[in-house]
Amino acid sequence: MRDRWPVPRRAGAVIRTNLEAGRRPLETFEDYVFYCDLMVNDGRHTYDGADAFREIIQHYPGTILLLNLRDREAWITSRLRHGHGEFARREMAARGLSDEAALTEAWRTDWDARLSAVRAHMADRPGQLVEFDIDKDSPADLVAALPRYGLNPEDFHDIGNSRTRRLSPLMRRLKAEIAHRRPRFFGK
């Protein structure tokens, strides 16, 4: 989701607010087909809308959950680097953790618990859980798992993959400054 769309940039905040108010999780933007980037963190509170998968399935019983997988430790490393460390700092503050080691252990626990919970909850819903390993599976595998959407594997490419990108020292510094200083408006 992007700001130019008629949906708030942080869908996770909308999901959290809706559930707190007793509404359906995706109320106000139910016409969309795909939802992602459901994490909200302002340094005081952290909420991952992906944890609302039970409520989403309850209110939208035909939903297909796409569970993106990758090596857990690579995922943690990526999160630690996200926003030049700003995301990890906000997560530590919101969780009341004092060091990166405690945060990485919390993320390991979260990862294992979510995988187990999603798989258990979806066990009796064959065809509604699609697991996609971003390191091993191809776009063609994803397209094959979602035939009714008429997807084209050529439309999928890696956006946001910075593992192999090399920036000049000036660009690295500018990106870090922007990541640490940009205003964040997440509501409560």
What residue spans do the PLM features occupy?
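A structural signal for short, well-ordered beta-strand segments and their strand-loop junctions
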Residues: 2-3, 34-37, 64-69, 130-133, ...
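Short hydrophobic/aromatic-enriched beta-strand-loop microsegments
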Residues: 1-5, 89, 150-157
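PAPS-dependent sulfotransferase catalytic domain
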Residues: 50-109, 128, 140-144
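PAPS-dependent sulfotransferases, especially Golgi type II membrane carbohydrate sulfotransferases
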Residues: 98-188
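Well-ordered, non-membrane alpha-helical segments in soluble/globular domains
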Residues: 19-22, 46-54, 108-116
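PAPS-dependent sulfotransferase catalytic core
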Residues: 1-32, 38, 165, 171-180, ...
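Glycine-rich phosphate-binding loop used to anchor ATP phosphates in small-molecule kinases
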Residues: 28-57, 68
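N-terminal cationic-hydrophobic initiation segments that often serve targeting/anchoring roles
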Residues: 26, 56-58, 119-123
